[in-house]
Amino acid sequence: MFGKGGLGNLMKQAQQMQEKMQKMQEEIAQLEVTGESGAGLIKVTINGAHNCRRVEIDPSLLEDDKEMLEDLVAAAFNDAARRIEETQKEKMASVSSGMQLPPGFKMPF
Protein backbone atom coordinates (compact mmCIF):
# COMPACT_ATOMS: atom_id res chain seq x y z
CA MET A 1 0.00 0.00 0.00
CA PHE A 2 2.79 2.41 0.92
CA GLY A 3 6.14 2.40 -0.85
CA LYS A 4 9.43 1.96 0.96
CA GLY A 5 9.42 4.43 3.85
CA GLY A 6 6.11 5.80 2.61
CA LEU A 7 4.24 5.53 5.88
CA GLY A 8 7.14 6.96 7.88
CA ASN A 9 7.48 9.80 5.41
CA LEU A 10 3.76 10.48 5.56
CA MET A 11 3.86 10.58 9.38
CA LYS A 12 6.82 12.96 9.28
CA GLN A 13 4.97 15.24 6.86
CA ALA A 14 1.88 15.16 9.07
CA GLN A 15 3.91 16.13 12.14
CA GLN A 16 5.61 18.97 10.26
CA MET A 17 2.28 20.18 8.99
CA GLN A 18 0.78 20.06 12.48
CA GLU A 19 3.66 22.20 13.79
CA LYS A 20 3.25 24.67 10.92
CA MET A 21 -0.51 24.85 11.47
CA GLN A 22 -0.08 25.57 15.17
CA LYS A 23 2.39 28.36 14.41
CA MET A 24 0.08 29.73 11.70
CA GLN A 25 -2.92 29.72 14.05
CA GLU A 26 -0.91 31.70 16.60
CA GLU A 27 0.03 34.21 13.88
CA ILE A 28 -3.58 34.46 12.70
CA ALA A 29 -4.78 35.18 16.24
CA GLN A 30 -2.47 38.22 16.23
CA LEU A 31 -3.73 39.53 12.87
CA GLU A 32 -5.86 42.65 12.69
CA VAL A 33 -7.92 43.44 9.61
CA THR A 34 -10.04 46.52 8.93
CA GLY A 35 -13.30 46.38 6.99
CA GLU A 36 -14.99 49.45 5.56
CA SER A 37 -18.37 50.62 4.39
CA GLY A 38 -19.88 53.87 3.21
CA ALA A 39 -16.78 54.63 1.11
CA GLY A 40 -14.57 54.44 4.18
CA LEU A 41 -16.80 56.51 6.46
CA ILE A 42 -17.19 53.50 8.78
CA LYS A 43 -14.21 51.29 9.67
CA VAL A 44 -14.29 48.19 11.86
CA THR A 45 -11.10 46.42 12.91
CA ILE A 46 -11.23 42.81 14.08
CA ASN A 47 -8.57 40.30 15.05
CA GLY A 48 -8.03 36.74 13.85
CA ALA A 49 -10.47 35.45 16.46
CA HIS A 50 -13.17 37.72 14.99
CA ASN A 51 -13.20 39.94 18.08
CA CYS A 52 -13.96 43.58 17.36
CA ARG A 53 -10.95 45.70 18.29
CA ARG A 54 -12.02 49.13 17.05
CA VAL A 55 -14.91 50.98 15.40
CA GLU A 56 -14.28 54.29 13.65
CA ILE A 57 -17.18 56.49 12.55
CA ASP A 58 -16.68 59.61 10.49
CA PRO A 59 -18.20 62.56 12.42
CA SER A 60 -20.30 63.56 9.41
CA LEU A 61 -22.38 60.39 9.88
CA LEU A 62 -23.38 61.25 13.42
CA GLU A 63 -25.90 63.73 12.05
CA ASP A 64 -27.58 61.12 9.82
CA ASP A 65 -30.28 58.69 10.81
CA LYS A 66 -29.55 55.96 13.34
CA GLU A 67 -30.75 53.07 11.16
CA MET A 68 -28.41 53.95 8.30
CA LEU A 69 -25.48 54.21 10.71
CA GLU A 70 -26.29 50.79 12.19
CA ASP A 71 -26.45 49.27 8.70
CA LEU A 72 -23.09 50.78 7.78
CA VAL A 73 -21.44 49.46 10.97
CA ALA A 74 -22.82 45.97 10.30
CA ALA A 75 -21.60 46.12 6.69
CA ALA A 76 -18.12 47.21 7.80
CA PHE A 77 -17.95 44.37 10.33
CA ASN A 78 -19.03 41.85 7.69
CA ASP A 79 -16.37 43.23 5.33
CA ALA A 80 -13.71 42.82 8.02
CA ALA A 81 -14.89 39.26 8.77
CA ARG A 82 -14.70 38.37 5.05
CA ARG A 83 -11.18 39.81 4.84
CA ILE A 84 -9.94 37.89 7.88
CA GLU A 85 -11.40 34.66 6.45
CA GLU A 86 -9.59 35.25 3.14
CA THR A 87 -6.33 35.96 4.97
CA GLN A 88 -6.72 32.80 7.06
CA LYS A 89 -7.34 30.68 3.97
CA GLU A 90 -4.28 32.11 2.21
CA LYS A 91 -2.04 31.49 5.21
CA MET A 92 -3.32 27.96 5.77
CA ALA A 93 -2.93 27.14 2.07
CA SER A 94 0.75 28.03 2.36
CA VAL A 95 1.11 25.54 5.23
CA SER A 96 -0.21 22.61 3.21
CA SER A 97 1.48 23.54 -0.08
CA GLY A 98 4.45 21.21 0.47
CA MET A 99 2.42 18.16 1.38
CA GLN A 100 1.37 15.60 -1.16
CA LEU A 101 -2.32 15.51 -0.31
CA PRO A 102 -4.82 13.42 -2.26
CA PRO A 103 -7.02 15.33 -4.73
CA GLY A 104 -10.07 16.83 -3.07
CA PHE A 105 -8.60 16.56 0.44
CA LYS A 106 -9.86 19.41 2.58
CA MET A 107 -8.01 20.75 5.57
CA PRO A 108 -9.87 20.86 8.90
CA PHE A 109 -10.34 24.65 8.96
Curated annotation (Swiss-Prot):
Binds to DNA and alters its conformation. May be involved in regulation of gene expression, nucleoid organization and DNA protection. This is Nucleoid-associated protein YbaB. It comes from the Bacteria. Its main location: cytoplasm. It is found in: Cytoplasm, Nucleoid. Homodimer. GO terms for cellular component: bacterial nucleoid; cytosol. Keywords: Cytoplasm, DNA-binding.
